[in-house]
A protein has these predicted regions:
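A short helix->loop->beta-strand "cap" motif at the edges of active sites that frequently abuts
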Residues: 113-119
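Serine-esterase "nucleophile elbow" of acetyl-processing enzymes
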Residues: 1-58, 70-79, 261, 265, ...
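Active-site-proximal beta-strand/loop segments in catalytic clefts of secreted hydrolases
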Residues: 18-20, 57-60, 86-89, 122-126, ...
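Conserved catalytic region of serine esterases and O-acyltransferases that act on ester linkages
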Residues: 191-350
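Charged helix-capping and loop-helix junction motifs
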Residues: 98-105, 139-143
């Protein structure tokens, strides 16, 4: 089945886009010029009798290991008919097992939602990927990891980054002509991505397979976000306000010694939190073992506030129950204006 069969006789199609900041539209002068909107516009031109809608559930600065936990709430609730997944740039430094567990978790959740839902993996570009791999005639490692998952499920993929690399290198242009900060495309870069996608998409065949057995036995197929308010304890305050539009609520504490106890089952636990000018540090331990300090402030907090995530552990006994303990610390980064900890949800397996 090709896109003519998928889109040609439909009254309405909802396209889902799921990825990081590139897919969210970072770098575009206006939303209409980001590659997702341009792909939608080009498909609308190709199929004028079909109404195309776009649901862009991408979040900048996040990889597939958060995506596997937020997919249901952020994208699948909108009932997409077709899903593009783009995480190769943000998964660039993610180790293979977690990367593939996450991407496979995303795939299986989509297929659990609708077994016939077409999926396409999109591979974009950063200058770091280009220098470490394409300059040497190699395929970026994260793309290799993603492609193994794609091959297992017969999911088609489009490398939109390599044609962009070929364009600026063959014309002896600087990468900044398309990626001004060497990661996020300007309008010209977004348009290049969109044209590359539409050049390949019509020739693709969608015959996705759904094996009963996952490629990774511990893939994140059952990943969910559990509200942090469920674990509210002394010294913490509940806020029904949105966490920068990324989560509908959060809890906070700046009280040194304030603790949270979070029981969970399975191999992985994550924390969906914020990074702000007044963010502090907390210690965490799992199953009463030695605690580790985590700094929820970074240098980008001086420029903007944002939602982020942290995975304290991903290789625990998958058949066992565990307990995560968090404690707010008095110490903080010297550039932070406070020691506030804000948490929207915990990432765990059902």
């Amino acid at each position: 089945m090709n896109i003519d069969a998928l889109f040609g006789n439909k009254e309405r199609i909802t396209l889902g886009f799921f990825g990081g900041s590139i897919t969210e539209g970072a770098g575009a002068s206006e939303n209409q010029f980001c590659y997702c909107q341009r792909v939608t516009q080009l498909l609308q031109q190709r199929y004028p009798e079909t109404v195309f809608e776009t649901v862009n559930a991408s979040i900048g600065g996040t990889g597939s290991s958060l995506g596997a936990f937020r997919l249901k709430e952020d994208l699948l609730v909108h009932q997409p008919d077709f899903v593009f997944v783009e995480y190769a740039v943000n998964d660039f430094d993610t180790e293979k097992e977690l990367c593939q567990r996450s991407m496979e978790g995303i795939v299986r959740q989509i297929l659990n939602y609708r077994a016939s839902c077409p999926i396409v993996f999109i591979y974009t570009l950063s200058d770091e990927m280009a220098k470490k791999y394409y300059d040497k005639g190699l395929i970026p490692q994260s793309i290799q990891y993603h492609q193994e998952v794609a091959d297992y499920y017969h999911i088609p993929s489009i490398n939109a980054g390599k044609p962009l690399y070929d364009t600026y290198t063959s014309q002896q242009l600087s990468v900044t002509e398309f990626l001004p900060d060497r990661v996020h495309p300007n309008d010209r870069g977004h348009e290049h991505y969109a044209q590359s996608i539409l050049q390949v998409l019509p020739s693709m065949s969608f015959e996705i397979k759904y094996p009963k057995s996952p490629m990774q036995n511990n893939c994140l197929e059952t990943g969910v976000m559990v509200p942090a308010k469920n674990y509210l304890a002394s010294g913490w305050e509940y806020h029904p306000q949105s966490m920068f539009g990324r989560y509908p609520e959060y809890i906070s504490s700046s009280q040194p010694g304030a603790k949270l106890t979070v029981p969970f089952h399975g191999s992985i636990i994550g924390i969906y939190h914020t990074i702000q000018k007044d963010s502090g540090m907390f210690s965490y331990s799992i199953d009463g073992k030695e605690s580790t300090i985590f700094n929820s402030w970074d240098q980008y907090a001086l420029q903007f506030d944002r939602a982020c995530y942290f995975i304290p552990a991903s290789d625990l006994d998958e058949d066992a129950d565990h307990v995560l303990t968090i404690e707010v610390l008095e110490q903080k980064d010297e550039q932070s204006t406070g020691n506030m900890i804000r948490i929207g949800a915990f990432l765990m397996l059902e």
